[in-house]
Amino acid sequence: MTAQASEARELAAVIGLEVHVQLETETKIFCGCSTDVADAEPNTHTCPVCLGLPGALPVVNEGAVEAAVKVGKAIDADIPAETTFHRKNYYYPDLPKNFQITQYDSPICQDGELEFSVESERRSVDIRRAHLEEDPGSIKHVREGSGPLESRTCSIERADYTLIDYNRAGTPLMEIVTEPDFRAPGEVRSFLEKLEEVLEYLGVFDATRDGSLRIDANLSLVDASEVGEDGDIDKSVLEDANRTEVKNISSHKGAEQALSFEASRQRKLIQSGRAVEQETRHFNETHGNTVSMRSKEEEKDYRYFREADLPPLRVSHWKDEVPIPELPDARRERFVEEYGLSEEAASKLTSTKQVADFFEDVAERFDANLAATWVADNLLGELNYRDMAITDIDDRFDEVTQLVALVAEDEITAKNAHETVLREMLDTGDDPDTVVDREGLGKTSGDEVQQAVVEAIDENPDAVEDYHSGEGGAINFLVGQVMEKTGGSADPGDVNGLLREELES
């Protein structure tokens, strides 16, 4: 095909994902080593099993199986009566056994589905399979020097040597494999956000853990004419298209960025009449591009065979015995119906399980609309402004509730509570009473407000005349004068009413 003909082709992206999720368990998947390795010295959370020493025998972690069943039920997948483990053979420094224990032809979950929204439009992606496996260790490429190790980590091309930490080796992973149902990088980002939301609600995933979500994405471009109106593509078309696998993606934003770059790269190759190599590429977060790593492996290269040290795992009884909590979509609908919230407010309040739980705690004590305003708008808004997450203040929920109580009990104005007290609480770590006392924000008594109203009227005859002439801004000016006299501690609505009474008397 000539370059001119290639340039005229309209191309469509076909994207499939392999999402590796670290499951939240106390110990590793096949041994008793702790998974709490964030602050541990390298290679201190290891044993003969996760290091693959001769004679060491694996035992399946019940907590990992339970977490996998929860995920399967949440994505409406088929969970077989029995599942098995296999060895995936390949040689890489972070894999101490030179094989990975995973699942091959009998995964614990298959044929699932996950719904999500893209710009308010509902979408659905088929989940081909979700299986259990062990995480490899972690590799750091390092430059020579005298500074801290973290400051000397770099790309493999620039490294003087490489260090391997096997603390992570054996951490339980669930690999979730989608069908190639995505047609745009933005869809991938929305899907990952929804998947992480569901995993967090299930309690099987900790997004704050380093490397807890890693994505491999497969992308190819096909003629747009091959894509049906419903987005379906004939399997033979996909088999003929060369695809690239992009690795080292660790975030929703990174996935969108990596796939946008890769789609553009492939489009330029095709439009110039060149072939797209079937290969594995590495996503460079710093530069926002992908670079070639190696030719893409095929399934046969891994020489899968049954893991003889692990018997078949019977999981049929788990499907009925393992419950799952109310998931975000169901909770969102309930918030709209039960509390009369808007769709927008309900979406904010169910963005994480912790936010939703906190809202319901506050709503039990106070009016639901007041609780929604404080949690969805005030609290989340201030956290977002500071680039903080709800998990950063989960030990201060009682203090936030105490602040809402001051507003509900008319001890402080809503404006001062939000714009002064809440902001200072987040910036200084002080409790609400301390901020209120320091700033003198206790609500002014009725007599003091009435006195300030009279003084404002007496001192501003021009504004009074404007008010009686129908000038709309006059009352706002007088409210401002009263608020200034009371140090902002009066309620503006109350002041407005008192001024009108006094002016009309």
UniProtKB/Swiss-Prot annotation:
Provide the reaction this enzyme catalyses. L-glutamyl-tRNA(Gln) + L-glutamine + ATP + H2O = L-glutaminyl-tRNA(Gln) + L-glutamate + ADP + phosphate + H(+); L-aspartyl-tRNA(Asn) + L-glutamine + ATP + H2O = L-asparaginyl-tRNA(Asn) + L-glutamate + ADP + phosphate + 2 H(+)
Keywords for this entry? Answer: ATP-binding, Ligase, Nucleotide-binding, Protein biosynthesis
Q: Which EC number(s) does UniProt give?
A: 6.3.5.-
Q: Does the record's keyword annotation contain RNA-binding?
A: no
The molecular function terms in GO held by this entry are: asparaginyl-tRNA synthase (glutamine-hydrolyzing) activity; ATP binding; glutaminyl-tRNA synthase (glutamine-hydrolyzing) activity
Q: Which InterPro entries match?
A: Asn/Gln-tRNA_amidoTrfase_suB/E, Asn/Gln-tRNA_Trfase_suB/E_cat, Asn/Gln_amidotransferase, Asn/Gln_tRNA_amidoTrase-B-like, GatB, GatB_C_1, GatB_Yqey_C_2, Gln-tRNA_amidoTrfase_suB_CS
The source's domain of life comes to Archaea
Entry similarity comment = Belongs to the GatB/GatE family. GatB subfamily.
| Subunit structure and binding partners | Heterotrimer of A, B and C subunits.
Q: Return the protein name.
A: Aspartyl/glutamyl-tRNA(Asn/Gln) amidotransferase subunit B
